């Protein structure tokens, strides 16, 4: 019975249809007004062509809506994010161009997440890089998997509206892991967490942190916008502290939670491959990925 529920959740990951039931939440969280939405989309499209600061792959309504939602329908801010998104893709083609999408299952459980998606929390993504063995594949594969995860996630109108939280679990991180985190890699990860992606990041929670990892965070801090600092929370090894920010009902058992609807990115990719449709394949290929049968 529970597996059946999980399969329904996995299949829903490919849903790109607007949900009328989310419109009230979209107004509260994104300042989205159905009566003026089309006007905002037109203004953004006009700004793209008039300013000529970027050449996005798409300018259709559904694509532009992602950027408007994450910037609360303030058109100039949405345009600025779109410019950053296009520049990031242009400067980091190695993260997606010619990348075998299904080959990214190799990262296994270095990323995890819940699929409960409650309106007050959104999607929870968990970074567990301590579970990655640097001798198996380079750190760039983790970044590639993170970028693919973000691109696939923002296809869902639900996640565009609800956004989500990130838990960075440093259990198992050693100096061998830290040695792979160059400034370039740190810059890429920070950009994928919302600086250059149309992702609504509510908060970041660092757990299982110790002073020995100060270098780890110094690398990232350089690239984090000052305005985002208030949304970063350090919990040490205190799960109770984490639970003060995220309801245990939304957390998986390893953090004292009761949410059973969680999975690793390795399984997530396998299920996407099982349930994908022609529209998904076409979009991912247009983004530069190799999508095998």
Which residues make up each language-model segment?
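Basic, amphipathic alpha-helical/coil surface patches used to engage anionic, phosphate-bearing ligands
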Residues: 1-293
């Amino acid at each position: 019975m529970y597996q059946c529920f999980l399969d329904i959740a996995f299949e829903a990951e490919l849903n790109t249809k607007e949900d009328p039931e989310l419109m009230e939440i979209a107004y509260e969280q994104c300042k989205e007004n159905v009566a003026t939405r089309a006007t905002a989309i037109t203004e953004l499209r006009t700004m793209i062509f008039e300013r000529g600061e970027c050449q996005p792959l798409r300018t259709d309504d559904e694509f532009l809506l992602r950027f408007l939602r994450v910037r609360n329908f303030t058109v100039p801010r949405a345009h600025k994010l779109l410019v950053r998104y296009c520049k990031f893709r242009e400067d980091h083609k190695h993260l997606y161009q010619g990348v075998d999408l299904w080959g990214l299952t190799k990262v296994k459980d270095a990323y995890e997440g819940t699929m409960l998606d409650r309106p007050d929390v959104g999607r929870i993504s968990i970074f567990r890089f301590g579970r990655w063995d640097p001798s198996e594949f380079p750190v760039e594969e983790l970044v590639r998997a993170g970028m693919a995860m973000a691109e696939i996630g923002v296809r869902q109108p639900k996640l565009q509206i609800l956004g989500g939280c990130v838990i960075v679990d440093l259990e198992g991180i050693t100096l061998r892991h830290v040695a792979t985190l160059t400034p370039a890699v740190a810059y890429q990860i920070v950009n994928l967490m919302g600086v250059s992606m149309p992702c609504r990041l509510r908060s970041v929670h660092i757990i299982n942190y110790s002073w020995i990892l100060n270098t780890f965070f110094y690398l990232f801090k350089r690239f984090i916008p000052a305005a985002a600092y208030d949304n970063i929370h350090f919990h040490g090894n205190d799960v109770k502290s984490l639970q003060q920010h995220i309801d245990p009902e939304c957390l998986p058992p390893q953090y004292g939670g009761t949410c059973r609807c969680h999975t690793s990115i390795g399984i997530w990719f396998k299920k996407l491959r099982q349930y994908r449709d022609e529209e998904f394949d076409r979009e991912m290929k247009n983004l530069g990925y190799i999508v095998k049968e």
